[in-house]
Regions:
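Gly/His-enriched, cation/cofactor- and phosphate-binding structural elements
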Residues: 1-73
């Protein structure tokens, strides 16, 4: 399967995790990042999550991706 989007998450300070998202034209990462309180553009977007663990943040990201895919049909 071809990779259509990538997400990178990392701790940027003690209480903050940043997620950066990039995609090809088929996946609107802006909509996914908006579900986590962020934003951006169709193919480039980001968000910052405070006071969560990396695992909790990745779980929320996976939920947001699943919601996006369900909404797309």
């Amino acid at each position: 399967a071809e990779i259509k989007a990538v997400f990178v998450a990392g701790r940027v300070d003690k209480d903050k995790i940043a997620i950066s998202a990039r995609s090809k034209a088929e996946v609107n990462v802006q909509l996914i990042m908006e579900k986590l309180g962020g934003g951006g553009h169709f193919s480039m977007a980001a968000c910052q999550v405070e006071e969560k663990t990396v695992k909790e943040t990745i779980d929320k990201l996976e939920e947001a991706i699943d919601q996006y895919l369900d909404e797309r049909g």
